[in-house]
Design a protein with these regions (language model features):
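Compositionally biased regions
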Residues: 18-20, 80, 139
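A short acidic/small-residue loop/turn micro-motif
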Residues: 25, 138-141
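Positively charged n-region of N-terminal signal peptides that target proteins for export
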Residues: 1-4
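Bacterial N-terminal signal peptides
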Residues: 7-17
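Amphipathic alpha-helical segments typified by the pilin-like N-terminal helix
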Residues: 18-54
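Conserved long hydrophobic alpha-helices within structured protein cores
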Residues: 9, 20, 83-87
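Extracellular/periplasmic head regions of type IV pilus-like filament subunits
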Residues: 28-29, 48-120, 126-130, 135, ...
């Protein structure tokens, strides 16, 4: 007599526990996508700041610290490797030379987290305003362009 309700309860508990996993994974991916949005917005802000800095500084590009000192970026970026949300930003800057009329910069946004809650890796540089994306490792100019 009690076997049927206990069996039904066991089946319901199994179904409930199985449905929690996809829900939790979905929440983790939602957080990663929100962090990606913040990272890509930061890279686009950096690109605008670099173009403005370059126009004011004879074709040279600036480091994070130089961009902050000049008022092109806010204090969140005033570090050699600023961290925004769950991303770390890194930038390389090369000055102009006799062989190169303009300087060069590249900037990466790499997630701090790993596993299913990690976001994608992004890249932008002075040759294009396009964001490049790589799902598993630091992105480069050779990676595909990020689609909105």
């Amino acid at each position: 007599m009690f076997r049927i309700p206990i069996l039904a309860l066991t089946v319901l508990l199994c179904i409930a526990s199985l449905s929690c996993q996809p829900y939790s994974t979905g929440l983790q991916q939602s957080v990663a996508r929100a962090d990606e949005t913040a990272a890509t917005a930061a890279l686009r802000t950096i690109a605008v700041a670099q173009r403005t800095y370059s126009a004011s500084n004879g074709g040279d590009f600036g480091t994070f610290q130089q961009l902050c000192e000049g008022g092109y970026l806010d204090s969140r970026f005033n570090s050699s490797k600023p961290a925004l949300k769950d991303y770390v930003l890194t930038m390389e800057v090369a000055p102009k030379s006799e062989a190169q009329a303009e300087g060069f910069y590249s900037c990466n946004a790499d997630p701090v987290r790993t596993g299913p809650q990690a976001g994608r890796h992004f890249y932008i540089d002075s040759t294009s305003s396009e964001l490049h994306v790589n799902p598993g490792e630091s992105a480069t100019a050779k990676d595909p362009i990020a689609q909105p």
